[in-house]
Amino acid sequence: MVKYFLGQSVLRSSWDQVFAAFWQRYPNPYSKHVLTEDIVHREVTSDQKLLSRRLLTKTNRMPRWAERLFPANVAHSVYILEDSIVDPQNQTMTTFTWNINHARLMVVEERCVYRVNSDNSGWTEIRREAWVSSSLFGVSRAVQEFGLARFKSNVTKTMKGFEYILAKLQGEAPPKTLVETAKEAKEKAKETALAATEKAKDLASKAATKKQQQQQQFV
């Protein structure tokens, strides 16, 4: 059995902008699991299509139950090959990605097609398909379930990373990460607490002064 995923996403940016952002996605605050990226091949075909192959290195933290099945020295990084075909005339970009190590444990294959959104020519739609398989006897189903859940989580990070880079390229303020938002909220709460403490001290001081004045009136 192979786990299959199909998803549709929309980026509110033109195809040209998304195409430019695609090659500048890393690094971004949502791609900390992406360690390296290298272009290993690139060519322009006779029909003016751009073909590229990239090698990416990503962290591959295993679930705890899987760590018990493998030696401690098993690499925690996964190598990904990404082939892409860019057709500027028809404004489409198709990417194929798959892992080239840990293949016995799990293989994740992904196909994405980027094209102009049918409802808004200024937007870009992404059709994403993925196939997750495992050849491990006895635990392949659990591995595939884990792989599919991890893939969905990474898709969310990918889209947030895209939006972050697109905002930077378009001169807008990039959307804040949850860490940045939490940090700001913490700082604001600290400032509010400090202001409340100072106000309480001021009120207490005024109350003490007033009480002292009242006592002096009766002396």
From Swiss-Prot:
It catalyses: a 1,2-diacyl-sn-glycero-3-phosphate(in) = a 1,2-diacyl-sn-glycero-3-phosphate(out). Residues 36-174 form the PRELI/MSF1 domain. It is found in: Mitochondrion; Mitochondrion intermembrane space. GO terms for molecular function: phosphatidic acid transfer activity. Keywords: Apoptosis, Lipid transport, Mitochondrion, Transit peptide, Transport. GO terms for biological process: apoptotic process; negative regulation of apoptotic process; negative regulation of mitochondrial membrane potential; negative regulation of release of cytochrome c from mitochondria; phospholipid transport; positive regulation of cellular respiration; positive regulation of endopeptidase activity; positive regulation of phospholipid transport. GO terms for cellular component: mitochondrial intermembrane space; protein-containing complex. It comes from the Eukaryota. The keyword Mitochondrion applies. Pfam families: PRELI. PANTHER family: MSF1/PX19 RELATED. Involved in the modulation of the mitochondrial apoptotic pathway by ensuring the accumulation of cardiolipin (CL) in mitochondrial membranes. In vitro, the TRIAP1:PRELID1 complex mediates the transfer of phosphatidic acid (PA) between liposomes and probably functions as a PA transporter across the mitochondrion intermembrane space to provide PA for CL synthesis in the inner membrane. Regulates the mitochondrial apoptotic pathway in primary Th cells. Regulates Th cell differentiation by down-regulating STAT6 thereby reducing IL-4-induced Th2 cell number. Forms a complex with TRIAP1 in the mitochondrion intermembrane space. Interacts with OPA1 and AIFM1. This is PRELI domain-containing protein 1, mitochondrial. It comes from Bos taurus (Bovine).
